[in-house]
Amino acid sequence: MAFSPSLFQPLVIQKETHGGEPSSPNHVIACIPLTGYVAALVVNACFYPLLFCLPYSSCRASVCKTLVLYVLMLYNFILSCILVEDTQQPVGICLMVYCIILMAIWTIDRVRFCLLIRSLRPLIDMRSNFIRVNTVAGGVVIPVNYSKPWFVKNFNQRCRCTNCFFAHSATYLECTFISRFSKTTLVSISDFQLNGSHSTVFVPFNSRDSVPLHIIAPSVLTV
């Protein structure tokens, strides 16, 4: 209902002429009804909380958030086109400029990530930190929820997609942490076992920073 263009059809208001007054040209005023703006605000108000409240618990949830962002940008762009074509050109132009700038910044950022990690995954996943693992057969890129350059293999794996399962189970030659402004090679420093599962901690090579194992690993473990 909020997406219907009929809500944004301008209303034409004509000046009434009284019987005793001389006839004169009617003054026509065109305006978009309030329901159109209310519908647009309601849609945006519903999408933005959904965009920021969905968790990053899995790759599927992140893809859903990215699709919601695309739908929101498309909705606002179509709305701005409708406003520009009708009578609300200042409002429509401002909204269109906002949408174009937002889409340009998003596209540049995502294309840069695609070139950096040599994968199209950033186009459908809005996260900005990735782990790339290379094996003899090839490489796999998985997005991660944290921004620190470390990785714990086969531990607390929430996502069960093919790429995440491979990265947490395969034996690989190289592990790289890729963020927006850096690319860091990770090396294994410690192994531990928990509930019969063997996990490996990867940190940057020659790193002087301490690794908070109390955050990424439980307090009771066997090293």
Curated annotation (Swiss-Prot):
Keywords: Host membrane, Membrane, Transmembrane, Transmembrane helix. It is a multi-pass membrane protein. Residues 129-186 form the CoV 3a-like viroporin CD domain. The lineage of its organism: Viruses, Riboviria, Orthornavirae, Pisuviricota, Pisoniviricetes. This is Non-structural protein 3d. It comes from Bat coronavirus HKU5. Its main location: host cell. Residues 22-125 form the CoV 3a-like viroporin TM domain. GO terms for cellular component: host cell membrane; membrane. Signal peptide: none annotated. CDD domains: MERS-CoV-like_ORF5. The chain crosses the membrane at residues 32-52, 63-83, 88-108. It is found in: Host membrane. It comes from the Viruses.
